[in-house]
Amino acid sequence: MGLLDGKSAVVTGAGSGVGRASSLRFAEEGARIVCADIRLEWAKETVRLVERTGGAAVAVQCDVSDEADVIAVIDTAVEQCGRLDIMFNNVGVPTPRLGALLEDHTVEDFDRLAAINLRGVFLGCKHAVIQFKKQGGGGVILNTGSVAGLVGWGGTVYGATKGGVNQITRGVAIECAPFGIRVNAICPAAMPFTNFMAAGGMDAPPEAREEIAAQVGSTHPLGRPITAEDCAEAAVYLVSDRASNITGVLLPVDGGYVAR
């Protein structure tokens, strides 16, 4: 039996990176997945990958900063599976430009980071909790925070939004514990092919990308970059019953970065 047999899961940002890797792992462990992404074609590709391995998934377009979209995604899970068991609020966007300092950010940059990284998690938590309570309690929420929300390392605006995610995680965990609802977060360190590439590195030639990956990995005591698959393994554990007495945890997936 899989760790998530019979479970229904929503994964936001399922079209790439941690969201795609986690969707595949959740499906391998027996969950039925609603793959939500603002880029529908990317979500559909994740569904194809899930189905290729014998899993079950559907794709839904979703802007996590839009409350109606978030409600619709959860409704889809209930319609498809009869209930919601797992809500993985994974969507996040990086700082808009590599190396951007505080004074380099526009108000529009701030608003975009806050809308997606912070409001999106708030909405996902809010409506998952509403659904879990309708079902009589229980259920699991997992958020993607960041070590940037745990320590100061530059990227002030991004770090502020991720610090907010971390505090939402702890607050909702305490509020919802009496209802048997668990809430945790994974806090990855820098992942070169998600954070850095999304902020402009995709324009770099392949050899430069490899150099970026090596540089990022060298900042972690274990000496290698963090991958989407690393995060997916942590996610599977935290949403499974093996973590049934774990809530309010901010789990660094960071190669030892925070411990330095």
Region annotations inferred by a language model:
Residues 98-102, 106-111, 202, 212, ...:
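Substrate-binding pocket helix/loop in short-chain dehydrogenase/reductase
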Residues 103-122, 142, 165:
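Catalytic Tyr-X3-Lys loop
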Residues 116-135, 173-174, 178, 240:
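Amphipathic alpha-helical dimer-interface segment in Rossmann-like NAD(P)H-dependent oxidoreductases
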Residues 122, 222-253, 258:
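C-terminal substrate-recognition "lid" of short-chain dehydrogenase/reductases
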Residues 125, 161, 169:
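Active-site helix of classical SDR
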Residues 146:
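Residue(s) in the substrate-gating loop at a strand-loop-helix junction
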Residues 177, 182, 246-248:
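Short, small/polar-rich loop/turn modules that mediate ligand/substrate recognition or access, typified
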Residues 178, 190-219, 230:
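A glycine/serine/threonine-rich, flexible loop-to-helix segment
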